[in-house]
Amino acid sequence: MAVNVYSTSVTSENLSRHDMLAWVNDSLHLNYTKIEQLCSGAAYCQFMDMLFPGCVHLRKVKFQAKLEHEYIHNFKVLQAAFKKMGVDKIIPVEKLVKGKFQDNFEFIQWFKKFFDANYDGKDYNPLLARQGQDVAPPPNPGDQIFNKSKKLIGTAVPQRTSPTGPKNMQTSGRLSNVAPPCILRKNPPSARNGGHETDAQILELNQQLVDLKLTVDGLEKERDFYFSKLRDIELICQEHESENSPVISGIIGILYATEEGFAPPEDDEIEEHQQEDQDEY
């Protein structure tokens, strides 16, 4: 069973963010660059495998997780390992998976103390344990792709010599319209300086667009997943609404709550839109 650690106060023994990253990377043979990358939960699962061999099935860990529901899955695996080894620590999953620095830094500080209290110095091969899988997803893949794309499009791609139209109109057009490679290559490389470099940039942008589409698809699946759960909760509440239970009433109030200034559509408007949709078919 594990030795529990309850102290969370800041002391001289606390490592800086750089030292903490160095410890994580050296211990697990990773290449993390930010504390926020710990939000996937994969590193903690492997640390538990290092401390208590057999308490975690590493095959269940999504080492290449990129979406929030995948992070949650990894933390569920970690919670199961904590329960199995008698670790009393409550994992703030909802905060950690958001990828915020402060929440993840506080948790890794506690985990480092927990690790030091339980590690017996035995040899461990992290690459062999995870079978060579990469464990370095960005905390927010969508944001990273957006930011990188804007930077490259706004500064790296040469502009046309046409006197009409400001530069920002050209760059925004490229970003808002997801164009295939043939459209992005309007000007031949020979007509511009640094043609080969521009070709490489175009290929990179096309790959980023593909990655962005995959991210959006994943977010849509995640949205549908949680919407389905909310719908199931709504149906259960409606079945017991006649019981006048304050709990049921409270849940229904939360489900139907709207932001200030938002007006839900009237029934006749909904019927009108439904009729229009049927007419189209």
Swiss-Prot record:
InterPro entries, sorted: CH_dom, CH_dom_sf, EB1_C, EB1_C_sf, MAPRE
Cysteines paired by S-S bonds: none
Tissue: Predominantly expressed in brain and muscle.
Subcellular location(s) per record: Cytoplasm, Cytoskeleton
Gene3D superfamilies assigned to the protein according to its UniProt record, in alphabetical order: 1.20.5.1430, Calponin-like domain
Pfam families: CH, EB1
Modified residues (Phosphoserine): 162, 176
GO biological process per UniProt: cell division; positive regulation of DNA-templated transcription; protein localization; protein localization to microtubule; regulation of microtubule polymerization; regulation of microtubule polymerization or depolymerization; spindle assembly
GO molecular function annotation: identical protein binding; microtubule binding; microtubule plus-end binding; protein serine/threonine kinase activator activity; protein serine/threonine kinase binding
A GO cellular component annotation in the UniProt record: spindle midzone
Domain EB1 C-terminal positions: 194-264
Superkingdom: Eukaryota
Polar residues bias: start-end ranges: 158-175
Transmembrane segment boundaries: none
Record keyword Membrane present: no
Keywords: Cell cycle, Cell division, Cytoplasm, Cytoskeleton, Microtubule, Mitosis, Phosphoprotein
Ranges where the record places region Disordered: 157-181, 261-281
Domain notes: Composed of two functionally independent domains. The N-terminal domain forms a hydrophobic cleft involved in microtubule binding and the C-terminal is involved in the formation of mutually exclusive complexes with APC and DCTN1.
Subunit structure: Homodimer. Heterodimer with MAPRE1. Binds monomeric and polymerized GTP-bound tubulin. Interacts with APC2. Interacts with DCTN1 and SRCIN1. Binds to the C-terminal domain of APC. Interacts (via C-terminus) with CLIP1. Interacts with SLAIN2 and SLAIN1. Interacts with AKAP9. Interacts with PDE4DIP. Interacts with PDE4DIP isoform 13/MMG8/SMYLE; this interaction is required for its recruitment to the Golgi apparatus.
Entry protein name: Microtubule-associated protein RP/EB family member 3
